[in-house]
Structures are given as C-alpha cells and as structure tokens.
Amino acid sequence: GPGGEDGTVQSVLDDLNIPYTGSGVTSSALAMDKKRSKELWQEMGLPTSHFFVLTKETDWIKTLHALGGKSMVKPASEGSSIGMSRVTTPLQLQEAWAIAAEFDTTVIAEPLLEGNEYTVAIVNGRVLPSIRISANHEFYNYDAKYYSDETSYFCPSGLSVEREREIQQISLAAFKSLGCKDWGRVDIMTDEIDQFQLLEVNTVPGMTSHSLVPMAAAAVGLDFDQLVFEILKASCDE
C-alpha cells in the first residue's frame, strides 16, 4: 500500500544508497496508480476494462449506464482493496465515490467483473503458475484477504494449458510494461465472455508463509528459503 509500495520508501533508500529488492521508484509509483497503469495498458493493447474517473460533478445515472449498470469503485492508489465498493444503483455509485475519496483524490469506476479472479506471481523473470481465488464475499475485499477462513485458493488454478499460457503472457507483459523488476504479482479477472482483464500489479506482495507468492512458488518446488534466495538473486544480478 501507500508508503511501502508506491515509491516513497524506495526513494528514501535510493537517496541513502541502500540496495533493496523489487521495483524502483518510478515503476512502484506507476503500479500503485491504477488509473495510470490502465491507461498505459490500453495504449499497449493489453486487456483491461474501460473506466471513468469520478468527481462530485459526475452524472451518476449516465456513468453507471455506461458501465453496464454494475460497477466496482476504487481509490486509484490504495492497496488491499481498501475503499472499494460494489455498486448497482446511481445512489450507490455516488456513495461509493465519497467513500473512496476519503482515501485518494483520484477515484475510478470500472464495469463490475463477475468472473473468476486469478493472481500470477513473477520471480526473477520466471512466471509462476496462476492461482485462482474464491472468496465467499461480494468480492475479494480486505476481510476476505486477511481475516476470512472461507476464502479458498487453487494452484494449479484449473485453467487449460492454452489459457494458462495466455494468462502468464498477459501478466508478464503487464509487469514489464510498468518497468517492474525482480518480483511481483499481477491480479487478473475474467469478464462476462471469459476474457482476461488486468486489474493491477503488486510490486511488494505479501511474503508470509501463507501468502500467495510463496504458494505459487511451492507449486514449482521452491520452498520459502529458495523463494527468498531467488528474489535476492534477481536484485544482485542487475
């Protein structure tokens, strides 16, 4: 989230000439900003849903209609699904904007994606197997991520060989497009026609024993110590 993942800490470390793992200042800041990330992906032809920037002058009725009648509202630069809301009415859209605006001056609204949610880890240039996330919530929100015992993770994710190759290619392209390096995690969902849509890149994913990057690493035979070594090796090889 803000501070540790948006380039702030990275900038301080650069100023102090202290080496660190992961992406640099610019890439961290870009990845943290969902609006700028999505604009870049759209320019590059990478799959990501269209969006609107919400303000107090927004026409809530027209905007929700343009989003297909259902929307996910989120602060542009927050982590852990903080400030996000799922909406189905113009009034809810306005209320969701007010909630998100407490966390960020830029608030975006995307069409609501109701397909499967996946995350793909990248470590030292290697794309790890995708993980499918199944949350017993309206969406994979803060509680589902950190507190719920009802959130399930599947690795392998159940995708076909061709679809697994596709999601890995999209994830690596999105990661590289932002200038990210060493390691990270790319979040993706499927839309109503089962096409992958990029959500965001996490440049400092969780690294506890039950986090998703270690889970993906374990699927290819890397234990936690080996995973940490690969991340350090990626940084030292630069």
Language-model features, listed with the residues they occupy:
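Phosphate-binding site of ATP-dependent enzymes
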Residues: 88-169, 190-197
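Conserved N-proximal alpha/beta basic substrate-recognition cap immediately N-terminal to
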Residues: 1-50
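A glycine- and small-aliphatic-rich helix-loop capping segment at beta-alpha/alpha-beta transitions
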Residues: 9-20, 89-94, 219-222
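Conserved beta-strand edge residues that scaffold enzyme active sites
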Residues: 2, 27-28, 54-56, 114, ...
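ATP-dependent carboxylate activation and anion-phosphoryl transfer catalytic cores
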Residues: 40-45, 160-238
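Active-site nucleotide/adenylate-binding loops and adjacent lid/helix of ATP-dependent enzymes
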Residues: 29-110, 114-116
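Short small-residue beta-strand/loop micro-motif enriched in glycine and branched aliphatics
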Residues: 22-23, 81, 152-154, 209-213
